[in-house]
Amino acid sequence: MDKRISIAIDGPAAAGKSTVAKVVAKKLSYVYIDTGAMYRTITYAALEQKVDIENEEQLMEVVKNVKIEFQQGENTQLVFLNGQDVSEVIRTPEVTNRVSIVAKHRLVREEMVRRQQELAEKGGVVMDGRDIGTHVLPDAEVKIFMLASVEERAERRHLENMNKGFDSNLEQLKEEIAQRDKLDSEREVSPLKKADDALELDTTSLSIEEVVQKIMSIVSGVFAK
């Protein structure tokens, strides 16, 4: 396994991309890049600065002054905004419900994609998001598109929220996830879309271990070539 490849994992909100991507990266001793966390960090910074997130010009001022870094913690990846650990605060419902609005802006996405490509240029990365296989890493050797029903994804997010001590309403989550799907797939710039050469993986009735196993066997096939 000397060959260091790029692995792109795309899919809608709460499909389990990050959880699976982290495990795959760990198994391969690869770098995991959570592109969603990058957009969340920008969203958090904009909200903190009371910026109008519909205003692209104002958002770009925030982006220019934001340095995002990833560090491997004991059991998880830590996200830093200008040196401050924001790993937890970027996962609050307040940020979650606004991140698709921030991510729809062309200039914001262009800058984020530039940074993501820079992080991945040497290979040996597992990157997850909405447009990795289609736009960020179109030449990735492995492309996965993860799917799950809205109900299943809402259940997962509900459990995640409860475990983190956030207030959580399952029915409201179903509505919010459906709304994010709509925003993500209908936006003009890099919409949520399966790459033509991506393998579709419906995770609705699969455990994390089963999904990881499927991806690892796909990766093994690439290494064997």
UniProtKB/Swiss-Prot annotation:
Binding positions (ATP): 11-19
InterPro entries: Cytidylate_kin, Cytidylate_kinase_dom, P-loop_NTPase
Any GO CC annotation of this UniProt entry: cytosol
GO MF annotation, one: dCMP kinase activity
Catalytic activity: CMP + ATP = CDP + ADP; dCMP + ATP = dCDP + ADP
CDD domains hit by this protein: CMPK
Subcellular location: Cytoplasm
Name of the protein in question: Cytidylate kinase
